[in-house]
Regions:
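Hydrophobic alpha-helical segments and helix pairs
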Residues: 78-125
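A generic local structural motif
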Residues: 22, 94-97, 138-139
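Domain-core and long-helix interface of multi-subunit machines
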Residues: 13, 105, 109-196
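An N-terminally biased module of ancient metal coordination in phosphate/nucleic-acid-related enzymes
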Residues: 1-86, 90, 100, 159-162, ...
């Protein structure tokens, strides 16, 4: 089966085109399934929304309605699933579980971009020290252990701006992530950047 489950929309601020553009491209490329998994709009108490990372929470109903309308429109040509890409933010896991159930989502993926939140937390794509790698791995494994996620997205995110070839710390982190995924029966995505 040819499938992609990591598809963002223009609502997140770093994707372009319409939702339907993605569906038509997937059909043209012979995909059997397309999963939309825009970045989840966390309900931060202060209302913070990162302008180039995720949609505002007020956009969530329209996002879900759009994807579901496309699933109906293209039924028989491609199967379309509805989900979100999410970080492991312990303070929001209860909200995430409730939101998934209330909205009948098909899946969630673990895209472990930030430590704690995206307003004040460290962005794991800027990792440069062994301590930061350790935080990334610990957070990713804890997220996987919740059982809430279908797979681990771009597990090599910590290498994005690492600035040097994979060293002993990076190799140890990669091995630990692979071992955790195997132990938890968690698929890993291969998708980050053309430089790797």
């Amino acid at each position: 089966m040819k499938a992609n489950y990591h598809t963002h929309t223009a609502r997140c601020g770093h994707a372009t085109g319409t939702d339907e553009d993605y569906v038509l491209a997937a059909i043209e490329q012979g995909f059997d399934e397309l999963g939309f998994s825009d970045h989840v709009p966390w309900p931060y108490k202060n209302g913070y929304v990162h302008p180039t990372v995720r949609m505002h929470i007020s956009q969530m109903p329209e996002y879900l309605a759009s994807v579901r309308a496309l699933a109906e429109k293209y039924r028989g040509q491609i199967r379309i699933l509805t989900g979100f890409e999410c970080e492991y933010f312990p303070d929001y896991m209860g909200w995430l579980a409730d939101m998934k159930a209330e909205n009948g989502l098909d899946y969630l993926i673990l895209g472990n971009h930030y430590d704690h939140d995206d307003e004040h937390g460290f962005y794991f794509g800027h990792t440069s020290t062994a301590e930061q790698i350790r935080r990334y791995v610990d957070s990713a494994v804890k997220g996987m252990e919740t059982g809430m996620f279908a797979y681990l997205a771009h597990p090599d995110l910590f290498m994005r701006d690492y600035g040097r070839p994979l060293d002993a710390d990076g190799r140890a982190a990669a091995k630990e992530l692979c071992q955790a995924c195997k132990a938890l029966n968690m698929p890993m995505e291969y998708n980050l950047h053309d430089r790797f």
